[in-house]
């Protein structure tokens, strides 16, 4: 009788409408107690329960367990369900976690469930166990959450009769269940609530039955499997997005995406019934996933939608909460609302247990890692859950709560007087600026020395003046070489770059300058002994710079010497004396910006303008031995002034080769590097060191010019010499 009295008291408490704590936010507890109007009978029960238990404050649970077991299990009214697999009595709030921890994933447990015939008896039984005494629930009058009712009724219906009597199972009429052959039947009006209870169970994955259970267990499953079976069939039909490979063990179709990692590509390609080729569908799926429309992301939302729909459709009569358990329910509701990632609306009619265990992140997901939800189904769920659930084209309903699409960013932040130099690099002083400016100026100056200067392009010589371009290779190892001229012997000056002096010196060009390689400077011209010097300063920057260093260039050119050994003997036969085009290297006045070049002379002009070695005029001087303008390979550059050249020519001393070396400006600047440079003519071969005396090295003329202009200049030089 005591059990029935306690059950009647609990039912009376359930029938009362307990006000929500949200309505009393900021007010005292006394106002809530007055509104709740708790009877004195509850207080008597509390006193009675305190006799059989320890202190009430010692029985109060910690905050983490309050959502599962309530605030104080010593006097809270709560309900238990029995697991079909291990026959363990657990609370409905912790039933899902119990199944996942003890019996594996819920999807596998649900996959083994056969579709039993419907029977409207699931919501009739209530497993009433109290901390101090049990309470009874009827489907029509009891206010309970859909999850508690579905789970409790299902597991209780599967229990053997011995277990049910032991656990105080009761019916609304107060009649205990005596035999398994008498399942309680409900009137037809009670079927819709039972039907709605069943919708949420498959989504929670808690519908699982033991294969050896008594026959009364099958009616308790009522409409669960048909509902979910239709949903599974709808998912299996979409082969354009899902794997579709049939599992040989379970005989079920894989509902993962086309990019399933479980089955091989060959197995997925063999699936029949796809609208397009497998590769095309995979490419489309990946393209959609890049745009943020991946069905894999939508599948968790589909699960949430299925979870929420039944709780929203519940009629107002099927609502929750025991009178004494109301504080725990409202507490967990408010605790749950602190997380703004709940993207879908929650029904106020559902209890705290449903809120805690049916989170949008799916069971034991990581609730606090993503405080801001992803827009439109971007909820974070494990890949296994999303693949198990498959895909769905249904869109998510707009969420009720406010959420942000990205984490918040500060409008401003303190830099502590620093400056942003590069992404993530802040500087607090100007020392780096000075260093960078000095380094950049050094680099710019270094690079500018190697930049090519703009020089007027040289035109090709006329066809009637150009003889066969026969030339012998010049030895690049020599410090300075000059083309040897057949006919009247001249005093050649090497086109070396001389150090700058106070007088105007011969223009300096670094080794390998192709634009001025043929412009070999002459210290004395044919017209007299007066030295001709260019007004061009000696430190003129290089118009072109050889890519190879002089030492490397000399090695490369030395390799060619052996190939062209036979060139002098051929040229000896091909040079017919006076008819051969004679060439002399002269320096034109560059005051007008004209570059120096080599002028070609005919035989007649050569005869008229010939001169002796001592600088005096003569009719026709016999051709003397060739003069080589080579100096010692590693001599220091000796500056030669123009006045010295004049005095030497006027005194009548025999002309000698200038002992100057051809050093580039770069080597002069470095001062201590003994690298030899050479004058490389454009498209001309170098003369060998051991070439015969009568072999002439013809140099291509750099810039064509009329013979008349050359004769006028030479006559002017003659008059000055006299």
From Swiss-Prot:
- List modified residues, type Phosphoserine: 575
Return the Basic and acidic residues bias intervals.
290-311, 558-569
Query: Which residue stretches belong to region Disordered?
Result: 106-228, 288-317, 347-403, 531-600
Record-annotated SCA7 domain positions = 230-297
**Pfam family membership, one:** SCA7
List all Low complexity biased stretches: 541-556
PROSITE patterns per the UniProt record, alphabetical: SCA7
Task: Indicate, by first and last residue, each region the UniProt record lists as having compositional bias (Pro residues).
Answer: 181-191
Keywords in UniProt for this one?
Phosphoprotein
Q: Which InterPro entries does the record match to this protein?
A: Ataxin-7-like_regulator (IPR052237), SCA7_dom (IPR013243)
Q: Which PANTHER family match?
A: ATAXIN 7 RELATED, ATAXIN-7-LIKE PROTEIN 2
Specify the protein name: Ataxin-7-like protein 2
Tell me which species this is from: Homo sapiens (Human)
Source gene?
A: ATXN7L2
